[in-house]
Amino acid sequence: MKLSQFKFKLPEDKIALHPAKYRDESRLMVVHKSTGKIEHKVFKDILDYFDDKDVFIFNDTKVFPARLYGNKEKTGARIEVFLLRELNEELRLWDVLVDPARKIRIGNKLYFGDDDSMVAEVIDNTTSRGRTLRFLYDGSHDEFKKALYALGEAPLPSFIRRPVEEEDAERFQTIFAKNEGAVTAPTAGLHFSRELMKRMEIKGIDFAFVTMHAGLGNFREIDVEDLTKHKMDSEQMYVNADACRIVNNAKDEGKNICAVGTTVMRTIETAVGTDGHLKEFDGWTNKFIFPPYDFSVANSMVTNFHLPLSTLLMLVAAYGGYDLVMEAYHTALKEDYRFGTYGDAMLILDK
């Protein structure tokens, strides 16, 4: 398929700047693959489509406050540093993106905090905007991380055009976030409240948790028309024995398995064996899913409404069928659904 097939006009006022007041009260569009029927619901109604022993697979990654603002030595010029991942705990080395990149060179010192309490030195250039920083900090690793994160803020995507607010620390995180490492939230999971998950448990629905540390590659623009030539950034993922057991049992019993989000779908499609069963996995994936694609594990998925030309939209179109998903998006625009990270949700049912 071609990149241009995923272009559509998205007015800026359709992008949600804030989450719904309550997690489970965002809107939910239900799309039935077999009939093409589209229903309009509230997210907590998702319960009506699942039964005893069905399984929801969640991504339990935890977002860390990855965006820092600081100053460059001597000039005092304001700079932004986006933390990607820790490279070496002992040496306090981090892989980061910097802005403005042209002014930040090897050997520069960067200062963070009102009293310049945190200092970092640029020790390598990795890409045009990528740098390796060494943070200069006396104290334990835990104290360092605490001090670093106190200076950072929730790394909202650039299409949410507003300053970070207090609510973002909580709402840009799922309630089941556990394993730290993501620089963006697995957005489909944001709609699940404690109350909804309790009601799901009471109904006998099982939960499986996998981990994919969602990275900035989710928002990187594709610069090739031929999608087979696009390379995804690698993301770290884990699938443990518990998740395999829960998912494989449900599959063997013909139960409905729901992938909550594109990160979960990429994780399970990476970790599936040739027999269609989920296998344990600890490593990295750069799997890019776009139409046509044969899915092996899930027979339903929850996802948000994504931006034009995004790899996220391509995965959803591969799962729901290109024509049906693009029709659903057209309907969503007409019916004033909210798009993006803090927007509304879609449930695609294949059973």
UniProtKB/Swiss-Prot annotation:
InterPro entries assigned: QueA, QueA_dom1, QueA_dom2, QueA_sf
Pathway participation: tRNA modification; tRNA-queuosine biosynthesis
Disulfide cysteine pairs (residue numbers): none
Molecular function via GO: S-adenosylmethionine:tRNA ribosyltransferase-isomerase activity
Segments crossing the lipid bilayer: none
Enzyme class, first EC level, given as a word: transferase
Subunit structure: Monomer.
Descriptive protein name: S-adenosylmethionine:tRNA ribosyltransferase-isomerase
Record organism: Phocaeicola vulgatus (strain ATCC 8482 / DSM 1447 / JCM 5826 / CCUG 4940 / NBRC 14291 / NCTC 11154)
